[in-house]
């Protein structure tokens, strides 16, 4: 099976996207076809031995739409500086809307001004256009005022009738039929006007035809403008990569797209880092807020990794490029968000099914309502009014926009906070999670050993740490690196390098330092060497019971002291777990540590359950056991050995600093490596799902109530008959409300 993404053009409402899905799903070998109206994109899974891309494109084009294989954008490429096509289209719509509004207002004044009880004495019509004495002139004036409006709304007729002729009627078809019927009927009535017969002048409905188009155009313009805002997260990310980069060796400024991995770039203060890399020289603070959601600048020095698109704030950095093109962190983020916005949530399936039959059903209801009122004895003008109102008030757009707009805003909001969500389906499924399983190392803890206690047997802690760092400086062990790091942080000088360094596997090391024989290692090494450790033995046992690693240091057979190294708990872990509890979730800690050490960490952060002594390959088994017991599990981890467990869980969540394999296996990626983003992701899921439900409820209720009213239900019960103009206004408002509600989600504080 092969999965491809196609850009689809010519779609205007949910009926359009449903038509594209319907025709492509009928192709042999197509397993799945999902069309996202907002993203204007189709994701299709098919058997390449049974159908080709050319056949897929041909099928879509035959249905009246455009299709081309989606090309991955080169995010590292320079940003286009020309006019944004979307912005140009918005400007065109705005110009045409202004023209339509001016002529529609004039038409309303001419056609209906004399019907007002108080009249319009300030702007009287010349006698030449009097409805009573010069009926033909009165009718021709209305026609002349209506024609510019119809021209500005020409796309409704072009798209609507094209879709109708292709057998895929859409919202434009409804508007086009309704407006055209009013216009044609008015033209016929106009030609029936003679000097002797003026009665037909009362049957002119040019204003209905024109005002409906103007109001629907207003709704479309507002919808397009708001839809542009829903895509702002992607747009902002794509603008982060600078157009050019400065090569350190030659000092030349070159296009970012021409930079290769291994090149060294010079990044000046106040400029953006062009691509991912490692700092080879210099120190600075780097602002990564747009990429990770981290509000505070991050300190960078030699050896630090930097992300392309982040801002170098105050120092000069030399950066060796490690990733270019589609492999950069920024490109991966954009691809992640685009994929999420292009995929549908299961909750939208009902709306999609309704949208597929919506327009034909509305046309049938309009015809049926017209026939019933005609049989009831109403004149043609009344019947036409009902027919037009039903067509115009129906809004498949509200149904089609309900889910994708909320998902687009929700995933964009997540990306803004450093929370990447793989798909709309994950957004929906995440809301059902009731258990969060946390891997310990790198998730609850920092994942890097650090000195937690320095206990001298005599002398000072600084003196002990100085000797320990000097001895350990030649060792490659992670625990040794932690001790050296602690000494550097306290700005302690380690003095001379140790001599006669000897590694003692399973015990520690021996070295000569300033004429003294220094031992560094565990209890076994001290006992074998005859060093008395009784003064710190109980302390060592207590630290070991907490999951820490105590190391003894001795010189010439005398105990110098004890240094304990551990993987410290992240500062935010306890608060994050408390937030998960507030959301009603059960939190489980999964670790390979001993029971005593695991329970100590669990008590520190406040988890509900601890599962200790778990081998890496057993993590997925424990997740599956929880799932089998009826729990909906979110697994949170960062390492390669977490990938199977991430896949086994209902939702897999990878900490951003983790391995590429873990990130690829995950459904959600936390760019900040902050456990507090887990409850934020769950809240985002709940808010987005609530927004989708609100949108769908509004869309279904609007159509369920609006169509019967337009068909004359209120009139039959003694109430008023809905005008096509008000029907058009209501239809426009429904789409705007749906998009506006989705945009409201973007203002929420997670």
PLM features: residue spans?
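Membrane-embedded alpha-helical bundles of multi-pass transporters
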Residues: 116-136, 165, 184, 413, ...
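ATP-driven catalytic headpiece of P-type ATPases
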Residues: 95, 310, 434-476, 484, ...
């Amino acid at each position: 099976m092969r999965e491809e993404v196609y850009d689809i053009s010519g779609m205007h409402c949910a009926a359009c996207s449903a038509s594209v899905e319907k025709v492509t799903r009928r192709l042999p070998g197509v397993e799945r076809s999902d069309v996202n109206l907002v993203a204007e994109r189709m994701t299709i899974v098919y058997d390449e031995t049974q159908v080709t891309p050319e056949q897929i494109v041909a099928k879509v084009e035959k249905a009246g739409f455009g299709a081309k294989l989606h090309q991955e954008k080169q995010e590292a490429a320079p940003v286009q500086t020309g006019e944004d096509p979307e912005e140009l289209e918005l400007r065109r719509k705005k110009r045409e809307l202004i023209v339509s509004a001016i002529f529609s207002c004039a038409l309303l004044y001419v056609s209906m001004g004399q019907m007002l009880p108080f009249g319009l004495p300030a702007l009287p019509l010349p006698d030449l256009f009097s409805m009573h004495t010069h009926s033909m002139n009165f009718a021709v004036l209305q026609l002349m005022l209506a024609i510019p409006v119809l021209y500005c709304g020409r796309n409704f007729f072009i798209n609507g009738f094209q879709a109708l002729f292709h057998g895929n009627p859409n919202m434009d078809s409804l508007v086009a039929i309704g407006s055209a019927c009013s216009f044609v009927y008015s033209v016929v009535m106009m030609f029936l006007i003679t000097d002797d017969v003026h009665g037909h002048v009362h049957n002119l409905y040019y204003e209905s035809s024109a005002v409906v188009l103007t109001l629907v155009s207003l709704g479309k313009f507002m919808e397009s403008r708001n839809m542009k805002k829903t895509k702002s997260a992607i747009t902002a990310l794509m603008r982060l990569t600078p157009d050019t980069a400065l090569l350190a060796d030659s000092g030349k400024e070159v296009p970012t797209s021409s930079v290769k991995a291994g090149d060294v770039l010079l990044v000046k203060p106040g400029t953006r880092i062009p691509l991912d890399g490692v700092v080879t020289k210099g120190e600075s603070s780097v602002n990564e807020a747009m990429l990770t959601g981290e509000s505070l600048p991050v300190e960078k020095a030699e050896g630090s990794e930097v992300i392309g698109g982040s801002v170098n704030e105050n120092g000069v950095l030399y950066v060796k490029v490690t990733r270019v093109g589609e492999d950069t962190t920024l490109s991966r983020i954009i691809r992640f968000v685009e994929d999420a916005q292009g995929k549908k949530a299961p909750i939208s399936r009902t709306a999609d099914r309704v949208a597929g039959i919506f327009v034909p059903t509305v046309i049938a209801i309009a015809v049926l309502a017209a026939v019933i009122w005609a049989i009831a004895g109403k004149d043609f003008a009344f019947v036409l009014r009902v027919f037009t109102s039903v067509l115009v008030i129906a809004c498949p757009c509200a149904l089609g926009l309900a889910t994708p707009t909320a998902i687009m805003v929700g995933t964009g909001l997540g990306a803004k906070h450093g929370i990447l969500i793989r798909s709309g389906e994950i957004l929906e499924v995440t809301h059902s999670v009731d258990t969060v399983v946390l891997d310990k190392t790198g998730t609850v803890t920092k994942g890097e050993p650090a000195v937690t206690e320095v206990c001298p047997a005599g002398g000072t802690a600084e003196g002990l740490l100085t000797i320990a760092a000097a001895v350990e400086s030649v060792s490659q062990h992670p625990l040794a690196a932690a001790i050296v790091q602690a000494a550097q942080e306290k700005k302690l000088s380690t003095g001379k390098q140790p001599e006669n360094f000897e590694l003692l596997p399973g015990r520690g090391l021996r070295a000569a330092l300033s004429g003294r024989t220094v031992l560094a290692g565990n209890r076994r090494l001290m006992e074998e060497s005859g060093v008395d450790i009784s003064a710190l033995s109980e302390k060592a046992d207590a630290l070991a019971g907490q999951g820490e690693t105590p190391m003894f240091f001795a010189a010439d057979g005398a105990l110098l002291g004890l240094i304990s190294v551990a993987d410290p708990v992240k500062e935010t872990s306890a608060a994050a777990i408390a937030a998960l509890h507030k959301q009603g979730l059960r939190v489980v800690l999964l670790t390979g540590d001993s029971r005593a050490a695991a329970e100590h960490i669990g008590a520190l952060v406040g988890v509900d359950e601890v599962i200790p002594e778990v081998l890496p390959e057993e993590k997925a088994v424990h997740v599956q056991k929880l799932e089998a017991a009826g729990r909906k599990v979110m697994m949170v981890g960062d390492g390669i050995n977490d990938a199977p467990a991430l896949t086994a869980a209902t939702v897999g969540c990878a900490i951003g600093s983790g391995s590429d394999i873990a990130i690829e296996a995950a459904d959600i990626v936390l760019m900040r490596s902050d456990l507090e983003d887990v409850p934020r992701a769950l809240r985002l899921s709940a808010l987005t799902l609530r927004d989708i439900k609100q949108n769908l409820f509004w869309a279904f209720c609007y159509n369920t109530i609006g169509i019967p009213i337009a068909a004359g239900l209120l009139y039959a019960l003694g109430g008023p008959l809905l005008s096509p103009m008000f029907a058009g206004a209501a239809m426009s408002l429904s789409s705007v409300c749906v998009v506006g509600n989705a945009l409201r989600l973007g203002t929420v504080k997670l």
